[in-house]
Regions:
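Short, glycine/acidic-enriched loop or turn micro-motifs at the edges of active sites
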Residues: 12, 70, 93
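Short glycine/serine/threonine-rich phosphate/pyrophosphate-binding segments
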Residues: 46, 68-73, 96
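A residue-level signal for conserved active-site and pocket-lining positions in enzyme catalytic cores
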Residues: 9, 46, 67, 125, ...
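Catalytic core of DAGKc-family lipid kinases
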Residues: 31, 40, 79-155
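A glycine-rich beta-strand to alpha-helix segment
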Residues: 59-64, 68-69
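Glycine-rich beta-strand-to-loop/alpha-helix junction loops that act as flexible
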Residues: 10, 64-66, 89-91
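ATP/NTP phosphate-donor binding region
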Residues: 1-61, 75-76
Length: 155
């Protein structure tokens, strides 16, 4: 039986993830026999959910959120032994990784493009006990990113 976990960050993109959650669930239900949906409530949730899904033998983990949700989900899959296919729908402020991979920034278009038979390998790096898949930064950049308020993100 094929199983997929969907991790949704309900506050990503000013709440946009909630608006597209059912569309993603419907699309993935045409590709997997069982779909489980989990909503994040705070930091670390996506990592824990993804790790648990991999350890339970899920075939795929998809997330819907911004760069932080993508990063957390990748960390969970890595901690779970890289046993799941990873997919994501960008609904964040920057969506850096999706831009680098050529994934449409419009969530509806990104959902329509999902094809579980068309996957690609991405590189994963590790720094200390954290994994990263798109970039790593040190010094001023992460400090500035950490200090941006939700209100400033919407400007």
């Amino acid at each position: 039986m094929s199983r997929c976990l969907i991790i949704i960050n309900p506050v990503s993109g000013g709440g946009a993830a909630r608006r597209y959650a059912l569309d993603l669930q419907w699309k993935l239900s045409t590709l997997f026999e069982t779909i489980e949906v989990k909503f994040t409530r705070g930091e670390g949730d996506a990592t824990r959910f993804a790790k648990n899904a991999c350890e339970r033998g899920f075939d795929a983990v998809f997330c819907m959120g911004g760069d932080g949700t993508v990063n957390e989900t990748v960390n969970g899959i890595a901690q779970g032994g890289f046993s799941c296919t990873f997919g994501f729908i960008p609904v964040g402020t920057v969506n850096d990784m999706s831009r680098a991979l050529g994934i449409p920034q419009n969530p509806t278009q990104a959902i329509r493009r999902i094809d579980i038979n068309e996957t690609r390998t991405i590189d994963i790096g590790r720094c200390n006990d954290r994994y990263f898949c798109n970039n790593i930064a040190a010094g001023v950049i992460p400090k500035v990113v950490d200090e941006v308020t939700p209100k400033e993100k919407s400007i």
